[in-house]
Curated annotation (Swiss-Prot):
Phenotypic consequence of gene deletion: Mice appear normal by several measures, are fertile, and have a normal life span, but are neutropenic.
Organism: Mus musculus (Mouse)
Name the UniProt record assigns to this protein: Microfibrillar-associated protein 5
Annotated localization: Secreted, Extracellular space, Extracellular matrix
Motif (Cell attachment site): 30-32
UniProt record similarity statement: Belongs to the MFAP family.
UniProt main location, coarse: secreted
UniProt keyword annotations, A-Z: Disulfide bond, Extracellular matrix, Glycoprotein, Secreted, Signal
Keyword Ion transport recorded: no
Length: 164
């Protein structure tokens, strides 16, 4: 019976606490503001970013230079932001007077990363040709200056009724 009294006291206490007293949202749930990185993808590795000066001393072998002579001339390293939002459950301890309890709260962690990919000229040309085919345009070698132009490929999916 004593256990029922504690539940009733906790219920009355939860109802009587004003809603603005409870910290809602992401800010204010933890005391430390340490940015954490989480990933569920096993292919991604959260290594610390390397500095360009640290990589300046590393020279590729002659085999790598011979094989990549044409690739480096037509390819470039493109950097892009790959920001992810992760949802995690964190234990949060709340104390009211002398009684404390721990609850699991959902927190959202933003993982800001800069990713890079190798973009080659021939891949861009293939993508451009595929985009032209999807838009109903002729291949680039048969293009005439007075041919009707459609919007770019990225916008075509938005204009189709089934593209949503």
């Amino acid at each position: 019976m004593l256990f029922l009294g504690q539940k009733a006291l906790l219920l009355v206490l939860a109802i009587s606490i004003p809603s603005d007293w409870l910290p809602l949202g992401v800010s204010g749930q933890r005391g430390d503001d340490v940015p954490e990185t989480f990933t569920d993808d096993p292919n991604l590795v959260n290594d610390p970013s390397t500095d360009d000066t640290a990589l300046a001393d590393i020279t590729p072998s002659t085999d790598d230079l011979a094989g990549d002579k044409n690739a480096t001339a037509e390819c470039r390293d493109e950097k892009f932001a790959c920001t992810r939002l992760y949802s995690v459950h964190r234990p949060v301890r709340q104390c009211v007077h002398q009684s404390c309890f721990t609850s699991l709260r959902r927190m959202y962690i933003i993982n800001n990363e800069i990713c890079s990919r190798l973009v080659c000229k021939e891949h861009e040309a293939m993508k451009d040709e595929l985009c032209r085919q999807m838009a109903g345009l002729p291949p680039r070698r048969l293009r005439r200056s007075n041919y009707f132009r459609l919007p770019p490929c990225e916008n075509m999916n938005l204009q189709r009724p089934d593209g949503l």
